[in-house]
Structures are given as C-alpha cells and as structure tokens.
Amino acid sequence: MVSGRVQALLEQLRAQGIRDELVLNALAAVPREKFIDEAFEHKAWENIALPIGQGQTISQPYMVARMTELLELTPQSRVLEIGTGSGYQTAILAHLVHHVCSVERIKGLQWQARRRLKQLDLHNVSTRHGDGWQGWQARAPFDAIIVTAAPPEIPTALMAQLDEGGILVLPVGDEQQFLKRVRRRGGEFIIDTVEAVRFVPLVKGELA
C-alpha cells in the first residue's frame, strides 16, 4: 500500500513529465527515508535534494526518475553507477535490473550505502571504492552508465566502457551544468542535451 506522501510525489513526478511506470514503481518501492539522516526524515518524500554529509547530496526524486528513465533499462541491462553516495539511486536501479555495479570515491559513504542496501535485502549490487572518472574497466562493457556528480567534461573512460547501443547519462559543466545523454552507435557517440541541472562536482583521482 503506497502512502499518501508517496502517492503525492508520484503524481508530482508524472506532472513533471516522468512517463515510465516501472521507474515510478521503483521509486515507490524504495523507502527514501532510509537513505538520509534522521533530522531530514520528515522531508524524505519531498521533491528536493538533501545533504548526506561529506559535501554530498541525495538527488531530488525528479532527477533520480528522469536520469533513470533516460537510461532505457531492461532487466538484463548491465549498469554502472558512478557516485554511490547514499545508495538511494543504486537501490532504484537494483529494483529495475538484475545487477548493478557502483563506484564511490568516499569510503565512508560506500560502507554506509552497502549497509543500507543489505538492510533492504538488495543483494544484486557490487560496490567499489575508486575514482569514478575511470569507471570500472574490469566489469565493462555496460549497457547503461549513470553519473550522479558533474564532471566539467564527459570522461573518455566512461564513453569507452559503453557497449554498442549503450547509454551514458550524466550532468556536465562547472558553473553552468546540463544533463547529457550519450548513446554509442558504431564508432560514433551521439550526444543530446536534456535540461539544465545542478549537481556537486565529480572529483577526479582523489579518494577519501
């Protein structure tokens, strides 16, 4: 049974243009309050980003839904997430595909996310402490890659790890950021600009 707060959020997301009911069902199934600090639990089902510590945030539900929808996932999709963060986006993906690979550069966040996912019986996730700019070469290629922090330009390593027909969704930019979708077709990469966004920066090389 979906609560009134959850139902209200889903209706808001539909009004904002989210059409994929499988994505909306995944959002309804994942308890967002489990991925944030107790002090913010009363805001868990509001359509806003919230701080999770270490200078990072949990994205607003609209952006989670929009980026996930753009990936065009099937249950068989091989998915890489860059920026595990709280584990919320990871959990949404885990409800939609058979297996998710996720990279996080901040060790403390990685461990917290693993604990939360285990508590929710989501065992179809592999996490790695590493530099998101480099992706996860050992697990490549991927059908879908999602990046939850903004690099100033599209990392070439991530493009190289896309399989034929694969999709990369990420925010790009410094002061001015835009959500981009990159699709690999043959030897070419087709890049579409989706909308203006605001994300924390994707830090390069530096593990914490």
UniProtKB/Swiss-Prot annotation:
A Pfam family annotated for this UniProt entry: PCMT
MF GO annotations: protein-L-isoaspartate (D-aspartate) O-methyltransferase activity
Coiled-coil stretches noted in the UniProt entry, renumbered to this chain: none
GO biological process, one term: protein modification process
E.C. code: 2.1.1.77
Location(s) in or outside the cell: Cytoplasm
Cellular component GO terms held in the UniProt record: cytoplasm
Alphabetically ordered keywords of this record: Cytoplasm, Methyltransferase, S-adenosyl-L-methionine, Transferase
Source organism, top-level taxon: Bacteria
Similarity comment text for this entry: Belongs to the methyltransferase superfamily. L-isoaspartyl/D-aspartyl protein methyltransferase family.
Role this protein plays: Catalyzes the methyl esterification of L-isoaspartyl residues in peptides and proteins that result from spontaneous decomposition of normal L-aspartyl and L-asparaginyl residues. It plays a role in the repair and/or degradation of damaged proteins.
Protein name: Protein-L-isoaspartate O-methyltransferase
